[in-house]
Amino acid sequence: MEWTRTGIFITLLVVVCACTQKNKTVTDAEPDRPEAFANDDELLDYIQKTHFNYMWEGAEKTSGLACERIHLDNVYPQQDQDVITIGGSGFGIAGLLVAIERNFINREEGVARLTKIVDYLAKADRFHGVWPHWLHGPTGKVKPFGTKDDGGDLVESSFLMQSLLCVRQYVKDGNEKEKALAAKIDELWHGMEFDWYRNGDQNVLYWHWSPN
């Protein structure tokens, strides 16, 4: 009798596993990805365009900034599809400048996106001028990185500001819209209270600070 029960259990387990595999959908991340490239320049173009598209087509809709993650199956067990990465957005913003130079987008399109980003950052949560590690895209409110990490992240914000300063230099002598963008970046830059993150007169910079 015991063997019969064991056999039935194994049979049911196999059936369940088979059904699960049958219903599972595997999404090809890049169905049109070329299998070979004619030369190194073509490969480099492909890599740069793919990197750029994460920030361009894959950006969080409200902010224009980089998502912490993109799941191609659109399944987010932690409901974090709207989470923005501040440091990663810095890398993406630098990529937008490359995209303009490489004519992946025109300058006007790039400036419009960058202005949207900067306007969003000016309204989003900051802690003595410093952004948190993560933001909730639709609201601009802090998304805690950990139990005691719900405030400013100086390292991630520095990655972000490095790229914004590159943007500032790129547009500061341009047309009126570009000069206005550079001025907005200046305000954000000068608003970062690096001295606060020294915790007094200590000869250090604190990575994180939370009001809690």
Where are the model-predicted features located?
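Long, well-ordered core segments of solenoidal/helical folds
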Residues: Q48-G64, A112-G129, A183-N203
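Bacterial signal peptide processing site
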Residues: T20-K22
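Bacterial N-terminal signal peptides that target proteins for export
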Residues: M1-I8
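Low-complexity, Ser/Thr/Pro/Gly-enriched N-terminal "stalk/linker" regions
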Residues: D28-Q81, H128
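Well-ordered alpha-helical scaffold segments within catalytic/enzyme domains
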Residues: E30-L43, N53-Y54, G90-I105, Y120, ...
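C-terminal motif of bacterial Sec signal peptides marking the signal peptidase cleavage site
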Residues: V15-A18
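Membrane helical hairpin/interfacial module
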Residues: Q81-G90, A94-D149
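Extended ligand-binding clefts on enzyme/binding-domain cores
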Residues: D41-L44, G129-S158, D173-N212
